[in-house]
Amino acid sequence: MKKALMFTLLGVSLAFAKPYTIDKANSSVWFEVKHFKFNETRGVFDSFDGKIDADPNTKALNIFEGKIDIKSINTRNKKRDDHLRTAEFFDAMKYPKGSFKMTKYEDGKIHGDLTLRGVTKPVVLEAKIQAPLQNPMNKKEFMVLQAEGKINRKDFGIGKTFSDAVVGDEVKIELKLEAYAQ
């Protein structure tokens, strides 16, 4: 009886879930790292893609995964961006993509596996979901997903020869995604 009830509730929950398409023009994947301990360097990955399946009423995520194009890194400094693409940092030639795949969602936390430079580590992102929303211009249903977390760049072999005094070990990750119901 308990199993039947559990599967019924699971089925009802999934019945309201729907896929969403990320509106890349109104979305971003940011990072921030300390530079010489006192200043922050912010950057963005201009090219990314992802998959979202969510229940807009309960604001629960069923699927959340994405990929970034490492070559698209942009800190508004070409020399620095070119250096970040080298083997010393992201090694974009050998590892052209980074990825994240959710393993669990609960209580506003996205648990998942982040892969950078061929290294996969568990990461937890604090999430805020606003849904269901309606675009006042085209009347389409959409959602806004904001998530942030922190990683240690050295765990992924990124800039491992640079001390924390030059490039901070801790990197803040920030996602701001606008996505439309399919």
Indicate residue ranges for each PLM-predicted region.
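Sec-dependent N-terminal signal peptides
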Residues: 4-13
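Low-complexity, acidic/polar, glycine-enriched regions of mature
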Residues: 17-182
